[in-house]
Amino acid sequence: MVPVIALVGRPNVGKSTMFNRLTKTRDAIVGDLSGLTRDRQYGDASWQGRSFILIDTGGITGDEVGMDEKMAEQSLMAIEEADYVLFLVDARAGMTAADQMIAEHLRKRNKAAILVANKIDNIDPDVARAEFSPMGMGNAIPVAGSQGRGISALMEAVLGHLPRDAEDEALEQDVAEGEEAVRIPGPSEKDGIKIAIIGRPNVGKSTLVNRMLGEERVVVYDEPGTTRDSIYIPFERDGDKYTFIDTAGVRKRGKIHEEVEKFSVVKTLQAIKDANVVIFVMDAREGVVDHDLNLLGFALEAGRAIVIALNKWDGMEPGERAYVKTELERRLFFVDFADIHFISALHGTGVGNLYKSVQAAFQSAVTRWPTSRLTQILEDAVSEHQPPMVNGRRIKLRYAHLGGANPPLIVIHGNQTDSIPKSYSRYLENTYRRVLKLVGTPIRIEYKGGENPYEGKKNTLTDRQVNKKRRLMSHHKKAEKKRRDKR
């Protein structure tokens, strides 16, 4: 399971700056899932190959009223969700009553936490540590978040206390085996294809899970655990193994009450990270809403294969259906590679077809292609549509090979690759998708510039070459002397 780290502290101590630095912005979830998470913002981050989910919270002052009180409540909820807490304080302002209140809350909850003294620019780190030592949170780690100073030491201290995710361990093993190692995930003997069922509350996730498991199978799970535990449900269908990752929990069909279904962002994000394929469930009667786009965006950033299920399609008028299809085409253009199914989880209409799309998306996401095949596709694409000129020189793309899977990563080598425009990258992506007949999975293309293997190396001659050079020089001198003597 991917660990969760929460950033907490008073307002303006640098939590958002730290969040942006660790998520590198492009890895952060687009938006803050407004309406579901209030002021909590969730991001997918990594440090030296270790993945984790980061939560940015609103500030806590201890004297909140009205909306500020609700924001503080959300910050305290983030503490409960997290495996580890980064408690940020302002080294310039010194210790405050609000800092002491937060420290007391962390102690009462027996929460694993580390004290971070931020904004140490032009401040002696030892003085900063001494300032906050009365809080009883241990030695503060000094950082300057805006400049990135001290971040490495902080993250090494934090990640040393967190469990390793299975995917991270596999990637580290690849690195140990060599730079060119490529991990191609496949269905494990035990779990089969792991499918995450995600979506907003009340769209019918639990109804769909029970329907896909089979009418005759009634599953009851009442296991103790934290609020962010997901339910893993292994099963077989037509000889194929699967594992559902159900963020809503699985209940008896007669006891499913969609209106009280809990929604946890953390559970959803962790389920996406742990899955091979995501089935994204939407309510056809509500159409496409911003929350749907946010969740789909995270699944896309995580590189997971995607199947879209538009639930509650039954009973809709033809005009309503036509409008919804138009909206899907307009707003879901960024996942146009995903199969869309119009279903009724309650009545079972169209549900069986989901398995075919899951299988196709998974196979597209994990299939191996030899370097010769990927290079031939590249050469054909370049022949049909040349890359643009840069400073009077044509960009040259030499060969391509597979760099990873789930999602497929195609590494293209050439020169001036830093100057390749996004439009040409989209052209190559679409070409690979069309030729390889890929469905349901995003594709990532990575460029590597051509490097001169002799750059920076001295031209050292062998003994034989040195002797030959001497003979040639001696012969040249004798010939030159003869020419001068004849004159």
UniProtKB/Swiss-Prot annotation:
* Any one Gene Ontology molecular-function term assigned to this protein's record: ribosome binding
Q: Known Pfam families for this protein?
A: KH_dom-like, MMR_HSR1
Question: What are the binding positions for GTP 2 in this chain?
Answer: 199-206, 246-250, 311-314
One Gene Ontology term from the biological process aspect of the record:
ribosome biogenesis
Q: Where is the KH-like domain?
A: 367-451
Q: Where does GTP 1 bind?
A: 9-16, 56-60, 118-121
Q: Where is the composition biased (Basic and acidic residues)?
A: 448-461
- Domain (EngA-type G): give its ranges: 3-166, 193-366
Q: Where is this region: Disordered?
A: 448-487
Locate the compositionally biased regions of type Basic residues. 467-487
Q: Does the keyword RNA-binding apply?
A: no
Keyword list (alphabetical) reads:
GTP-binding, Nucleotide-binding, Repeat, Ribosome biogenesis
- Please give the InterPro entries that the UniProt record associates with this protein: G_ENGA, GTP-bd, GTPase_Der, KH_dom-like, KH_dom-like_a/b, P-loop_NTPase, Small_GTP-bd
> What functional role does this protein have?
GTPase that plays an essential role in the late steps of ribosome biogenesis.
Q: Which family does it belong to?
A: Belongs to the TRAFAC class TrmE-Era-EngA-EngB-Septin-like GTPase superfamily. EngA (Der) GTPase family.
Q: Which PANTHER family match?
A: GTPASE DER
Q: Which NCBIfam families match?
A: GTPase_EngA, small_GTP
What is the name listed in the Swiss-Prot or TrEMBL entry for this protein?
Answer: GTPase Der
What is the source species?
Pseudomonas putida (strain ATCC 700007 / DSM 6899 / JCM 31910 / BCRC 17059 / LMG 24140 / F1)
